[in-house]
Amino acid sequence: MDQFSQFTCRPENQEMVSPALISSLGIAPEDIYASVENITAIAAAAGKSAGRDFALLPFCHTVEAKAMGADIRPADDTAGPRAGAYTLNDPGELPPVDISASADAARLLRASSALRDGGWRVVYQLSGPISIFSCMTPLSGLFKCWRKTPETVGASLDRLQDMLSRFTEVLCEAGVEYISYSDPAGNANILGPKYGSLLTERFTLPFLKRIREICGDRCSLLICPMTAASLSSGGHLLAAAPDGGDIAVCCVKREGCMKSKNFKLR
């Protein structure tokens, strides 16, 4: 599994959709999630522009955090949606919410169904806990809390797992064909070996097993190569795989990856 440790997330893999493409559709940057029509138009145009046979949703890694109360600044001509002021003083303040009930998520779900009905294979990018927390609280504070009161962070991770699992169920019902799990802010280079291992064992592995069961035959699960590297370093990668021993590892934003017939790695 050494190939995963060599994977780097380049700037071109970070950008979900270009401001120029949004502008060409006559949509204001701050309105990318304002309507189902806007979402479907952007996703379809981005798919066609990249030569993909799938539509990629959402267009940022902030949707789940916003549903949980994060202050998310809207996209503009220079950048996509991003975190504003921090809203949590402590990870233990994370509220239990229904992600699918938030306005943006609800429109994304309807857009997923509309894109599917329009002949698109829909790939939905599900964000992990560190990416979510990074929108709501300083990561330095998260690690301090994790060190002093690990049970507080553990309880927050349990709540996150429940919320994201319920959202996965709704995504499957909406007709999403692939769920791509990634945690850009939670890779081993940022967390370090101690917290990387804790996150893998406390959240990532049990969560992937849980949503794999939720997906069943309705939806395929993909994991980011950076997440795969974290699982692999602890010897957990195959434990996250289905009983047959295969797991799909793929960067959905990297050209050619989803087109490959060999994206299932043993």
Walk through the language-model features, giving the residues of each.
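Conserved, mostly hydrophobic/aromatic
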Residues: 47, 115, 164, 171, ...
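Short beta-strand segments at enzyme active-site cores
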Residues: 55-58, 122-125, 176-183, 218-225
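Active-site-proximal loop/turn and secondary-structure-junction residues that shape catalytic pockets
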Residues: 60-61, 128, 185-187, 225-229
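Active-site-proximal loop/short-helix segments
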Residues: 123-145, 174-200
